[in-house]
Regions:
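N-terminal membrane-targeting/pre-transmembrane regions
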Residues: 1-59, 165
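Alpha-helical transmembrane segments and their immediate juxtamembrane interface regions
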Residues: 63, 72-78, 145-150
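Membrane-embedded or membrane-proximal helical elements that form or frame transporter/channel pores
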Residues: 58-67
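Cytosol-/stroma-facing membrane-proximal "stalk/adaptor" domains immediately downstream
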Residues: 159-179
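Non-transmembrane, membrane-adjacent beta-strand/coil modules in membrane-associated proteins
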Residues: 13-18, 95-157
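Conserved beta-hairpin
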Residues: 69-114
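Short, solvent-exposed secondary-structure boundary motifs
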Residues: 67-79, 128-129, 135-140
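Glycine-centered small-residue hotspots that permit tight backbone geometry or close packing
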Residues: 48, 74, 127-128, 159
């Protein structure tokens, strides 16, 4: 058990996007965009040769080219830095989808918790912070997780590579908070 501030951490899992196809597509698109605009900028701005049948002005190319390259590099870095951090502490369940979202669910707000296998694409439309026909999901890879029913009746799925341990820890802490 770890300490975070004055809170004891009973379970902690850090997950990142590891889907090979995602990374092939993302890195491939980034390399293509950087190469494409890099070639065009060198050809037109440095060598003075028109790039394309209707070329941009040098100023527009000097703005759009690096802007598009930075955008693609930024998207790639964002996916690289995304982490789903799930913690069970004394006062509740902490879910962080760093750097985008942070949520704390007190145990008294969890009506039920069960481990289940799910279909990320069919049920939620993929991975990430998703809203689907079965409620909201936080997931980054795989097809196993913990299904919660919250006190307001909303279902919430948390994807996990250790779903049994996560479910057991949530239920243990949840039962203690009900006593």
């Amino acid at each position: 058990m770890n300490q975070t501030g004055d809170q004891e951490v009973h379970f902690r899992e850090i997950q990142q996007f590891k889907q090979r196809l995602l990374w092939i597509l993302l890195l491939g698109a980034s390399v293509f965009v950087v190469t494409f605009f890099g070639y065009g900028m060198i050809k037109q701005i440095l060598f003075g040769q028109r790039w394309g049948s209707r070329p941009m002005s040098n100023l527009a190319l000097a703005i759009v080219g690096p802007g598009t390259m930075l955008f693609m590099i930024g998207i790639t870095y964002l996916f690289y830095s995304l982490k789903l951090i799930t913690e069970v502490r004394n006062d509740g369940l902490y879910i962080r989808f760093f750097p985008l979202a942070h949520r704390i669910i007190p145990f008294e707000n969890i009506k039920s918790c069960e481990v289940r296998t799910y279909s990320p694409i069919k049920e939620y439309g993929g991975w990430g912070i998703r809203h689907g026909r079965k409620g909201k999901a936080y997931n980054v890879s795989g097809n196993r997780g913990v299904q919660l029913e919250l006190s307001e009746g909303k279902p919430l799925l948390i994807g996990s590579q250790k779903p049994k341990e996560l479910g057991r820890t949530i239920n243990k802490k949840r039962n203690k908070s009900l006593i």
